[in-house]
Amino acid sequence: MLAELNAEVLENTYISGNLYRLTLRIPDKILKQIEPGHFAMIKPSDTYDPMGRRAFAVADIEEHKAVFYYDVYGKGTYLLSKRKPGERLKTFLPLGKRLFSYEGDKHLLIGGGVGLAGLTLLAKKLRDMGKKVFIAYGGRSREHLGMVEWLEKEEFPYELFTNDGSAGRKGFVTEILKEFSTDWVVHACGPKPMLKTIKEMKTGHKVYFSLEERMACGWGVCLGCVVKTRDGKFKRVCYEGPVMPMEEVIL
């Protein structure tokens, strides 16, 4: 059941680079409905400038709380970064129809930048199911790997990649694919060039993309988040996604 809330801000903390962590108070009856892949549409300010909401993956769930990570890259997220604990944000969740597959016993999660936030709830779910999980996390530099603290707290096996070599291995996070056999199911979330590279590598893995597109509504009405599919049609990321098999989409 979708819910529209005036959710209380519990935390809105700068992490590093452009990354912030936002924690909202959410009723437990709503939290119980949230599955990996679900997202929320959050209005960053109480004004009409900007008018629209912004889409954020639900990165973690705690008692009475939902956690989100976001990069500040425009007016909306800048205004969001200024919101203080105790203030309230118009929040619509849980959104997303097509969610992650749990098939297979071994799962490689590839997160690029803030895209890792789209995979963290999945990682915990798979672990709870007794699945083997490995996380590869990449960014431009050390300061763009702000979710390392989460990885360490949750004690997942992981490897870091940075373009400039300032943390972890120097290179692109997609290189990790060459080191895992094809019986590992791959889940990836991050910038479109990263996803495109994974698709072009043709490693033979079963791959699922959690897609990130700009959204105005979040429930399939505005058609602002469509992606082209191999059958020549278009699918709405918010409604026929956000998770789609790699072979379905054209990037």
UniProtKB/Swiss-Prot annotation:
GO molecular function, one term: flavin adenine dinucleotide binding
Keyword Iron assigned: yes
Ranges where the FAD-binding FR-type domain occurs: 2-101
Keywords attached to this entry: 2Fe-2S, Electron transport, FAD, Flavoprotein, Iron, Iron-sulfur, Metal-binding, Transport
Presence of keyword Ligase: no
Positions of [2Fe-2S] cluster binding: 217, 222, 225, 238
GO biological process, one term: pyrimidine nucleotide biosynthetic process
Cofactor note: Binds 1 [2Fe-2S] cluster per subunit. Binds 1 FAD per subunit.
Protein name per its UniProtKB record: Dihydroorotate dehydrogenase B (NAD(+)), electron transfer subunit homolog
Higher taxonomy: Bacteria, Pseudomonadati, Aquificota, Aquificia, Aquificales
